[in-house]
């Protein structure tokens, strides 16, 4: 009897919610003319059915093939636009910028990033400009990236030691875990002065948060429904994660209030934020929550994107042995006899750098760059309404035959023939974004990919675990904001002897 009553209540609640949403849609004003084209919509859900069972970047690429590079998709209540060409992307990110410079808000980002009081997900504002300026000038300048060289060398040396131990025991290595630990340790020491307690747990929390922050939760699609927001099954999980994250970040903040200096004998980035917090000249007060959000940004942007790219590089090299052989030959010839390599040393590794570029073309760290319209604007002749969600399909543009010869083939040599970079000037190739919201940690992140990668290629030969063939490798992506591999990468290292 109790079960029947509970079922009846659930049915009534769902029916009531659906009725309200239908009434709201009926009352909507007549659509504006000259909106982007899109597929036929279903009542209430719009185009949500097109995403079911698929990764969003794949599903939206199919929409663009049929309806063009500026396409409208209705995600529940949310008017959304997918941009899939370099021309449309350039307009949105450069020509009409800052009209499209906001981030759209999701339940995941709002909870985990302290009401979006950070840099990554903050709306375009005085606060965002102030925090970004501090970030770039105090932590992520090219000069500072080079000054962190000894940290990279120390942490890579630690990684090589673990790999040699595993090789001596004949064991396969979970490279996913090892690379995550490496990037986390580098970022902790560079940004916070030392490797923090609970850093491994924080990395896992970041990974979970990013998987739930893409804006594709049901409550994100129907923001006006208080009931759906209340019933959102991931919301309670997010709040549990937020409480644990807050405890870890609060400990970091309190520890910095007590300590005298970081690893360099001077200020680290948190010390800088504390100093700026007391500065009467700053335009927007820096709250403790903003500092915590910044720390969480540093972990989410730094650890996840660098490790994701490094792992995809290694996966593609294992899948393409001839590319692996060519990259190793270059690294071993150029760096033979050298010790303590860092950023300047890897600049001469042209082929390895092309391998990294090719990896980011096929596996961008952020497959769909999220933006939001701050005001009505025009892109490619179409009207984009105020508050529209914009999704720039970086994954799709990286595989578009209009821009790339043999787009589904891993072919680093293509960059010998065509001059393209990822600094935000070639809009068909923007793994770090473009415009005023281009990733401020581009140089730092790239150094944390290229320097460890050169060491992995120089010091070890690699084979797949359990006798697997390259053609058997699973190259699937996981769901979420970042384009991480779905499965961990297990490899068997064999130390390389330069004298042999």
Curated annotation (Swiss-Prot):
CDD domains: CYP71-like (cd11072)
Gene Ontology MF annotations: (S)-limonene 3-monooxygenase activity; heme binding; iron ion binding
Chain segments annotated as transmembrane: 3-23
Keyword Membrane: yes
Topology in the lipid bilayer: Single-pass type II membrane protein
Pfam family, one: p450
Source organism superkingdom: Eukaryota
Main subcellular location: endoplasmic reticulum
Binding site for heme: 439
UniProt subcellular location: Endoplasmic reticulum membrane
Coiled coil: none
Protein name: Cytochrome P450 71D13
Organism: Mentha piperita
């Amino acid at each position: 009897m109790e079960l029947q009553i509970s079922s009846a209540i659930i049915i009534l609640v769902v029916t009531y919610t659906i009725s309200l949403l239908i009434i709201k849609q009926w009352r909507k004003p007549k659509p504006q003319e000259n909106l982007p084209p899109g597929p036929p919509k279903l009542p209430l859900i719009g185009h949500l059915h097109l995403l079911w069972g698929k990764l969003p970047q794949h599903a939206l690429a199919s929409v663009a093939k049929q309806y063009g590079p500026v396409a409208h998709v209705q995600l529940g209540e949310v008017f959304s636009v997918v941009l899939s060409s370099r021309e449309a992307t350039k307009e949105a990110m450069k020509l009409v910028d800052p009209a499209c410079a906001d981030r759209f808000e999701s339940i995941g980002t709002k909870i985990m990033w302290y009401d979006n009081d950070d840099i990554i997900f903050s709306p375009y504002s005085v606060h965002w400009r102030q925090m970004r300026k501090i970030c770039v000038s105090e932590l992520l300048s090219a000069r500072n990236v080079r000054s962190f060289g000894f940290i990279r060398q120390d942490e890579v040396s630690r990684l090589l030691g673990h790999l040699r131990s595993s090789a001596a025991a004949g064991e396969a290595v979970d490279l996913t875990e090892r690379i995550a630990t490496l990037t986390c340790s580098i970022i902790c020491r560079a940004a916070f002065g030392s490797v923090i307690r609970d850093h491994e747990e924080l990395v896992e929390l970041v990974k979970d948060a990013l998987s739930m922050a893409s804006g594709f939760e049901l409550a994100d699609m129907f923001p006006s429904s208080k009931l759906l927001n209340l019933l959102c099954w991931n919301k309670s999980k997010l709040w549990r994660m937020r409480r644990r994250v807050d405890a870890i970040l609060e400990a970091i903040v309190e520890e910095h209030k007590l300590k005298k200096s970081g690893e360099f004998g001077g200020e680290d980035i948190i010390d800088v934020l504390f100093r700026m917090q007391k500065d009467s000249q700053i335009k927007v007060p820096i709250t403790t929550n903003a500092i915590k959000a910044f720390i969480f940004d540093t972990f989410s942007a730094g650890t996840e994107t660098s490790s994701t790219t490094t792992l995809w590089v290694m996966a593609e090299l294992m899948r393409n042995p001839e590319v692996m052989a060519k990259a190793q030959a270059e690294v071993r010839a150029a760096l033979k006899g050298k010790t303590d390599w860092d950023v300047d040393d890897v600049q001469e590794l042209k082929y390895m750098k092309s391998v990294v570029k090719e990896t980011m073309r096929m596996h961008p760290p952020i497959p769909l760059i999220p933006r939001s319209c701050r005001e009505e604007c025009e892109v490619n002749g179409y009207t984009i309404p105020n508050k529209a969600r914009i999704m720039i399909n970086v994954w799709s543009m990286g595989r578009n035959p209009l821009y790339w010869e043999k787009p589904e083939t891993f072919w680093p040599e293509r960059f010998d023939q065509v001059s393209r970079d990822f600094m935000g000037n070639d809009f068909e190739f923007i793994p770090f974004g473009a415009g005023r919201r281009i990733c401020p940690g581009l140089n730092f992140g790239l150094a944390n990919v290229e320097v460890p990668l050169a060491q992995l290629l120089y010091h070890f030969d690699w084979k797949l675990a359990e006798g697997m063939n390259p053609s058997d490798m699973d190259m699937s992506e996981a769901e979420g904001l970042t384009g991480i591999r779905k499965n961990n990468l297990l490899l068997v290292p064999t130390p390389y002897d330069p004298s042999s």
